[in-house]
């Protein structure tokens, strides 16, 4: 019976470490995204290959610090000349 308690304790510790590691990967901008090219434009005027990669960057420390957002469901190069219309303004 004691072995089962030790096993459960080790399993619980491993699960906690796995969750903490996964969270820190997302905060560093490391995400498992599909390799599908459906470009989107971020408020930093950078084109991301797909929405998942942009969301990953948005959830990173740098993305949160810069208030990164999606401004268009297309490549930034394809936006009209008046890009400021797409960027959300803070009031």
From Swiss-Prot:
It is found in: Secreted. Keywords: Antiviral protein, Blood coagulation cascade inhibiting toxin, Disulfide bond, Glycoprotein, Hemostasis impairing toxin, Protease inhibitor, Secreted, Serine protease inhibitor, Signal, Toxin. Disulfide bonds join 31-56, 33-52, 41-76. Residues 1-22 form the signal peptide. Anticoagulant protein that decreases host thrombin (F2) activity via an uncompetitive inhibition mechanism. Inhibits amidolytic activity of host plasmin (PLG). Inhibits amidolytic activity of host trypsin. Inhibits trypsin-like endogenous activity from gut of female mosquitoes 24 hours after feeding and weakly affects enzyme activity from gut 3 hours after feeding, suggesting a possible role as an inhibitor of endogenous proteases. Interacts with human PLG (plasmin). Does not affect activity of host plasma kallikrein (KLKB1), coagulation factor XIIa (F12), factor Xa (F10), tissue plasminogen activator (PLAT), urokinase (PLAU), chymotrypsin and neutrophil elastase (ELANE). Does not affect thrombin-induced platelet aggregation. This is Kazal-type trypsin inhibitor. It comes from Aedes aegypti (Yellowfever mosquito). The lineage of its organism: Eukaryota, Metazoa, Ecdysozoa, Arthropoda, Hexapoda.
